């Protein structure tokens, strides 16, 4: 997805910013990038296409505020992770004062599917108010932890039972939504789906 986005805007470098709190993720991504290089899918004149593209993996020490795009850019540049005044916007003057597109991994993960199947097909996925798909991370509290992509509107119980293969230990509640998420008691799980409507 990042390579396709880079091609669309004429970029030759994609920066993968991964927080240091996730060392295993950093290593997995570095191995994936090395594998792409070994297969000739990144670098100069990729597969004789005339297209150049490289990935730079950054193990970031940034604080939570670095989730904001301009604070993230400051962190990558080795500066304090503080929000920048706008304008200029990153697309005008971003990383090292060059035009920069900033997206999260979930957005970029959708790009290949959208390119292959079309935006209209992607918009038909999900519910009326929550289109597309979502990435769901299941931790070691599940029998089969991992990251899964599900269509918006998928019942939360189905995610737990079919993808996570149930809980690995007795569970009273789930923490959903990352640092700014909430605690959901097990009695509410069957009323929820992976969408914006049921979580309001």
Segment roles from a protein language model:
Residues 26-152, 164-166:
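Hydrophobic alpha-helical positions that pack around
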Residues 75-87, 187-200:
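Active-site loop ensemble at the mouth of alpha/beta enzyme cores that anchors a bound cofactor
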């Amino acid at each position: 997805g990042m390579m396709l986005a880079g091609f669309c805007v004429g970029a030759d470098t994609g920066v993968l910013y991964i927080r240091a709190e996730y060392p295993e993720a950093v290593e997995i991504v570095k191995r994936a990038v090395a594998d792409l290089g070994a297969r000739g899918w990144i670098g100069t004149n990729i597969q004789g296409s005339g297209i150049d593209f490289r990935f730079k993996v950054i193990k970031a020490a940034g604080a939570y505020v670095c989730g904001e795009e301009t604070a993230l850019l400051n962190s990558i540049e080795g500066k304090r992770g503080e929000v920048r005044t706008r304008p200029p916007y990153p697309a005008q003057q971003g990383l090292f004062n060059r035009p920069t597109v900033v997206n999260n991994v979930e957005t970029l993960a959708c790009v290949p599917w959208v390119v292959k199947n079309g935006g209209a097909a992607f918009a038909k996925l999900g519910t009326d108010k929550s289109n597309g798909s979502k990435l769901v991370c299941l931790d070691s509290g599940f029998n089969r932890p991992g990251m899964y992509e599900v269509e918006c509107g998928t019942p939360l119980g189905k995610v737990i039972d079919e993808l996570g293969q149930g809980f690995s230990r007795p569970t009273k509640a789930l923490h959903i939504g990352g640092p700014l998420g909430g605690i959901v008691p097990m009695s509410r799980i069957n009323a929820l789906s992976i969408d914006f409507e049921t979580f309001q």
